[in-house]
Amino acid sequence: MNHARRKLVKFSLGSLAATALPAWSVSIRAQQPTVSIIDAGGSNVVVCDTADGLVLVDSGTPTYASTLVDQLRAVGNGRVHTLFNTHWHHDNCGANELIGDSGAAIVAHQKTWQRLATQYYVPHEQRYVEPLPETARPTVKFAGKGSLQVGAETIDYGALVLPHTDGDIYVHFRNANVLVVGGAVTPPELDPELDWYGGGWLGGRAQSLDTLLALADDATLIVPAAGRTLTKAELSTERDMTHELYQRLNKLIRSGCSATCMADEGALEGLGRRWQDPQRFLYAAYKGLWAHHYNLAPDIL
């Protein structure tokens, strides 16, 4: 983000329109009457204001943690009621510790709790990521579905099947009609991120996009972990592209194709998408497909 040109944005949430609110030093991506989507260092943070406190989905990058939390204190009653983590990558959990220290509940997939509580390796960066402090880790863990009522807002949430990592979830603000999808969805301007070492793979992404599409209607605001918001029509296009790509790569890997071979065979052509780093994406997709070879075909080996 260009700090020199970043625009300071004032915004209001629902009934707080008459209340003095801070000039945010993070950009507002989109707003609904009770929900704002904030770009906190390249990572989207969703803020829902209710009479019982704020509900957040993800907490931005560590660099923006203090700024984000300081400015949240000026919204509504200034208290974070609940924080959801859509997955365990640290660039989406940056303010977890500060928010957890304030007494907020942190809700996440069981696998996210496990990942945040232990050291894990990032192969493409050749480094280990240390566990987060205990107060930064989820206090409510699940592996299926759940629902939460905070103020007047009904919030449904559920696990997704390995679209990005092994700990992905969605969060659906039913009344506001905002569906937060984390790393399971990527706007077409960005390449899909498949953390193959962390469990994410293309088949899981295709299945998860089916799940998410069934939750949305034509008015739903769909919020990924990074980048702009999407419509249901755009999500449908992403789903169709992902299923087509899965079929192509499945066929190629069964024929003995490597990631480089997939590129040479034009696996990414004609999909209506401009790829930023096609070789990197194909490598991650290839590794993920091999990790899940038992789901491809009985003769894969």
What residues fall within each predicted segment?
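Active-site neighborhood of phospho(di)ester-bond hydrolases with catalytic His/Asp-centered motifs
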Residues: 57-59, 81-89, 107-110, 180-182, ...
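Conserved beta-strand hairpin/beta-sheet module of binuclear metal-dependent hydrolase folds
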Residues: 31-71, 171-173, 177-183
